[in-house]
């Protein structure tokens, strides 16, 4: 990527989920100090008789953070469906965004595609409440002809960062996904908190650090699990009741044959989310293939420089490198080899048992 890409109009956008219930939170006041969680002047309670206030100032590692104040009021089913439809919501956002840009500069969508190209990289991050947020770097590039598609140039004049910001906010407010009637005629939208920040050239490295931090988070932040689970394992998992409710709702939705293609059960451990942690548009930056090829060439040159054998150096320096595998066999070649292996394994087991017994006698 050219160094001039840092001068293109670019935004760091955070797209959040809507509220599915009141949860314990940690907020900072104008002075930067943490504030009380959910202070209320009245003694209001929910329909289940649970007080809707919390006067505590939670620590950053407080296990209550992200937990619903009333578990019965929290819409776990809606949250699972929202996570499940998030990838489709983002796909439609990428369709709405160029249209919103075209409206703001007063031209048709077709003409816009001849002038600019929207590039992005997004990272999915789990929040403590179990919902997935997206952190996205969105950049405007000049649209290039097909024979120069790999080139990245600055967009024409008139396509500044202010135009891009207005379009992002408009697209986020307009886009929606209507789910099938089998899910209760549920409509998926972005939450009201859309954070948009301008990225200056000197901030590129800092934003990359943010994205790397978000990419390392997983469902563990919400108290979830990293592996797939079956319905009969849910009750025995070491998770919070909040996460357990997510899992049960996912498996309840998976039981409906009409929803089989949405794979709620297969992604129950991900709280319904089916997308990737990190994705990008084709021309945003280099490709994984290019990185693999560069890494392969680097390792090849390192091995070539370290080798002292003339034949190996000649083979490694060949223009064409061919590697092949041939199936030799499975298991032991003879019955005697199998007997020796079984005897060695039996002796190892006996020695471990004897060592454990010796430790018990010493205790």
Question: What does each model-found stretch correspond to?
Answer:
Residues 21-25, 145-148, 220, 224:
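Short helix/loop capping segments that flank catalytic or ligand/cofactor-binding pockets
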Residues 13, 112-146, 211:
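Histidine-centered divalent-metal-coordination microenvironment in nucleic-acid enzymes
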Residues 4-7, 129-130:
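Extracellular/periplasmic catalytic domains that process cell-envelope and extracellular macromolecules
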Residues 84-115:
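A short, contiguous, amphipathic alpha-helix enriched in charged residues
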Residues 137-182:
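Helical (often loop-to-helix) elements that flank the catalytic cores of nucleotide-handling enzymes
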Residues 10-18, 213:
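Active-site-flanking beta-strand signature of metal-NTP-handling nucleotidyl enzymes
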Residues 186-363:
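Long, low-complexity, charged/polar intrinsically disordered accessory regions
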